[in-house]
A protein has these predicted regions:
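Soluble metallo-hydrolase cores and metallopeptidase-like ectodomains found primarily
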Residues: 1-18, 41, 191, 198-199
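Active-site-adjacent substrate-binding region
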Residues: 87, 96-205
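A substrate-binding/cap region within the structured catalytic cores of diverse enzymes
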Residues: 7-11, 59-65, 117
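Acidic/histidine-rich catalytic neighborhood of metal-dependent amide-processing enzymes
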Residues: 17-113, 142
Length: 205
């Protein structure tokens, strides 16, 4: 929803420059807006809530709970008191040319059956080079605060691996449309749509 206000992961001369946030911010929004446009294709008994969290990327690494301010607030003050859902999927940096999505550590702890189901769907759709069934370290992201506040099982589709870190354009002026890859957005969007058409089986037991 929002972007890091400065390119503090780039060269010194650019570290006070704003970034477009085409991937780290806008890519997830783009996929969800397209999903919303096509939501009429879903069965009538499938309920979908789409939430855009603000102020996710305004924090300071050394300051606890300074990131993900929108999701922290929503988890304590949901739009419907007592709100719950069968599961949730967070999208973060889902438009990169080299994007690879691993089993993020917190997601595996809180919703392993969802991870397995979503990644299986992606691989069956031909996206096994993007959705890789290999675990990586936990990250603090919006899904962490949603789970903490609501206990809704959450998974994070995020371009991150503990050995390589975030994409090279992350928090730099190069996070722009030139580095957005339409096939990556398509892979994530189609995987999401098919997940809604065939939810994880354990939801019905």
């Amino acid at each position: 929803w929002d972007s890091r206000p400065v390119a503090d992961n780039g060269p010194i001369e650019n570290q006070n420059s704003p970034i477009d946030g085409a991937n780290d911010g806008a890519s997830g929004v783009a996929v969800l807006l397209e999903l919303a446009r096509n939501i009429d294709s879903l069965p009538e008994d499938v309920g979908v809530d789409i939430i855009f969290f603000d102020a996710e990327d305004l924090g300071v690494s050394e300051v606890e709970n300074s990131f993900c301010l929108g999701s922290q607030y929503w988890a304590k003050n949901p739009h419907v008191p007592g709100y719950t859902a069968h599961f949730g999927i967070l999208l973060d940096m889902v438009g990169g040319k080299k994007a690879k999505f691993y089993w993020e550590g917190n997601s595996k702890n809180w919703g392993s059956y969802i991870l397995s189901h979503v990644w299986t769907i992606a691989q069956e759709l031909g996206f096994s080079s993007r959705f890789i069934t290999e675990s990586t370290a936990p990250v603090i992201d919006d899904h962490a605060y949603v789970y903490e506040g609501t206990k809704i099982p959450m998974v994070d589709i995020i371009d991150y691996h503990h050995s390589s870190g975030f994409p090279e354009e992350w928090h730099t002026v190069n996070d722009n449309l030139e580095n957005i890859h339409k096939p990556t957005l398509h892979a994530v969007g189609i995987t999401l749509e098919n997940t809604l058409l065939t939810p994880p089986p354990s939801l019905f037991y």
